[in-house]
Amino acid sequence: MKKKILLMMSLISVFFAWQLTQAKQVLAEGKVKVVTTFYPVYEFTKGVIGNDGDVSMLMKAGTEPHDFEPSTKDIKKIQDADAFVYMDDNMETWVSDVKKSLTSKKVTIVKGTGNMLLVAGAGHDHHHEDADKKHEHNKHSEEGHNHAFDPHVWLSPYRSITVVENIRDSLSKAYPEKAENFKANAATYIEKLKELDKDYTAALSDAKQKSFVTQHAAFGYMALDYGLNQISINGVTPDAEPSAKRIATLSKYVKKYGIKYIYFEENASSKVAKTLAKEAGVKAAVLSPLEGLTEKEMKAGQDYFTVMRKNLETLRLTTDVAGKEILPEKDTTKTVYNGYFKDKEVKDRQLSDWSGSWQSVYPYLQDGTLDQVWDYKAKKSKGKMTAAEYKDYYTTGYKTDVEQIKINGKKKTMTFVRNGEKKTFTYTYAGKEILTYPKGNRGVRFMFEAKEPNAGEFKYVQFSDHAIAPEKAEHFHLYWGGDSQEKLHKELEHWPTYYGSDLSGREIAQEINAH
């Protein structure tokens, strides 16, 4: 009887092993059904999938990816797919709701940007990358962490390589039987992107004019990666004639800087183009944001590479012609965030502004979580500092062994946690001090003093979060010592920095990168 049971179990094991092999064979020979959101995602995914899948696209040309609302039919299409690929939650803002509505766990969801850090979106840039040497950070006041970031990474060939790699890795992990094909396809596609990247670098690295003016601020990554400055203007669209007032101010701006071209996301109407030419003396040209191609355009042979090369050709109408440095119409850098304010605007604050549980960012610097931040800063500095130099600079600034701080505004206590050991002291407000930096901007230190005589090194503390009046802090830099408040005022090189304990390292890196 025992032999029969063992034989039966062996047969069952062989049967299931055979079934698993057959299932893998069917998957290996069959095609993966992939739904993508809009054109760049579709293009990059096809480059990875090749002949091993059927790739479709939800949005037609002319559809705004931000505002798209998927129909019931669209949801079902995603539900029935093997994989769903999108660019980023900041681009396809509707995707988070779609993910929640999916009932099938078989759908592999792929985010093109992966763990890529993004820069601040238009209108959210705090303009202080040049202030790093005096540590003039800005406070972030957005409640959400999605809408404030720029998702247009595909307009930089350099960053598009990372997007393709992310899609490749995610699909290879989901379908290991097809991984070799996906990797081979991606390698071929990435080589084409590298060639495009070389073309952009060769054409723009020695540009005679580094600034270009655009009506659609989608080209920040392209500008960043190839050493240019994107200047965004408002009040001008390709299909609506500017007001007489706007034409008058634009005309002065154009003449002041010798601007020859304004770039639009699509062909400007003849009326708009004529008005700009006649009244402002500037021509209209197209830089495509590549959010969609029509079926007719694709059948005619247009694709990501042809459009990007056309963009480069059009951009060179500006970059190949020497001219004075073009500055934005309005100087948006002299804000309270960046240290420009009047003395009368500075108000006293209470410890409750910093209530909560806070974690040091220093461990994330040590483990490499912040490495992308240094790469971004190096590019923003345009050669003034390298990524390694930024990391060294911030290593000095962030360094601390106080890994956590808990602040109770009601009890007016601060608890310092070092290697698991806690020390709690009670604090009274000791006033504020306005510090003036060599470049002309300023900062405010809000001072507190411990009541306990045994507070030691934590006797005096000073907060700096780049706010100048009562408001809830999102992060802060803390200075502490046992000698005097005056001695702490002189500390400009070492500023331990703290973010909410509920944030992940990547979330903190993203916040730092956008400031």
Swiss-Prot record:
Residues 1-28 form the signal peptide. Zn(2+) binds at H66, H152, H216, E291. Coiled coil: none annotated. The keyword rRNA-binding does not apply. Keywords: Ion transport, Metal-binding, Signal, Transport, Zinc, Zinc transport. Residues 129-148 are annotated as: His-rich loop. GO terms for biological process: cell adhesion; zinc ion transport. Residues 125-148 are annotated as: Disordered. GO terms for molecular function: zinc ion binding. InterPro entries: AdhesinB, Bact_metal-bind_prot9, Calycin, Lipoprotein_PsaA-like, ZinT_dom, ZnuA-like. Part of the ATP-binding cassette (ABC) transport system AdcABC involved in zinc import. Binds zinc with high affinity and specificity and delivers it to the membrane permease for translocation into the cytoplasm. Belongs to the bacterial solute-binding protein 9 family. The His-rich loop facilitates the closure of the zinc binding site and is required for zinc acquisition. This is Zinc-binding protein AdcA. The gene is adcA.
